[in-house]
Amino acid sequence: MKLPREIRDQICIYAVLSPTTAPDTTQSFEELTESRVNFKNPNLRAWCSLVLYSPNPPTSTVTSLLLVNKQLHSETRSNLELLAKSPYCSLDLIILDEIVLLPTWTTIPVPDTTTLNTVDVTFRIAGVHQKKKEYPYGPYKGFQIGDGAGPAMQWQIYAVLERFIRAGFSGETECRNTHKHITAKRINIDIQTPPDVSPERFGRPANGYPRRRRKEEPKTVLDPDYLAGFVRGNLGGLMVGLNYEWFNYGQILYEHLDEIVLCKDGVEIERWDVAERLKNVVPESHLSREKLAEYKEEAWALRRARGLKVLDN
């Protein structure tokens, strides 16, 4: 505590922003999933919510710093107030064996905030598809196609976003109807190429065709370019409003986000201005001009109240 206050503040902020270690993807399927659970609350709209979370609340260095002594408690509080002006968090998201998603919060500087400036999401691909791993998770998961529902993975990714907006960092609530309305100025999504995998091993999802018989298990690894296109198509579809269903599920984006940026290995692929997308949604056969105008008026009011970008129609 004899260091100058400026240096102590730098050390404190460094400690608060230092990420926790993300799971090691060289572990086996069983090692990565054995301690994880599929949360029940809140009630999600996603058709498939097969996402396995750690049952323990996300950890943060903030709590330990606050408990050291009165002086450090006070200084940490002051630094948290500064960080709260531009709150940031980061999420590690593993797609394991093309079947399940494993989210892990690695940075949570301000755990109790509901208004975030930036959310960094890193997609990592782990393992190869093995049919025997599918059985505990039911018939609809991963890239398998559902009757009229598209690949389950689009809903699993949607469920991660929906649960975050509704439940925050903990991912779970006591009540089914809880909605914390977490907002973010920007979500940065970076899809990373698995290290130490030769390009010729990359391929399309091996579990996307459940009725096709195979004599042996595939040896391919999910292609990060395919995954980037998959995420791009599904996120873009939610904000285009091509039909009532897409528009209906896209409302959670319209009401809680300003911008989504999609990258692969740090290189930008697509950038969506959510307010601009909302402005440009047009009526279609299942949504009258009057109903759309009514919704937009409500959505703009919500965005204004939540400090998000608002445009003139």
Give the positions of each predicted feature:
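A positional/structural detector of protein chain ends, strongest at the extreme C-terminus
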Residues: 309-313
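C-terminal-biased hydrophobic
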Residues: 9, 52-297, 307
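N-terminal Skp1-binding subsegment of the F-box domain
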Residues: 1-35, 39-52, 63-64, 71
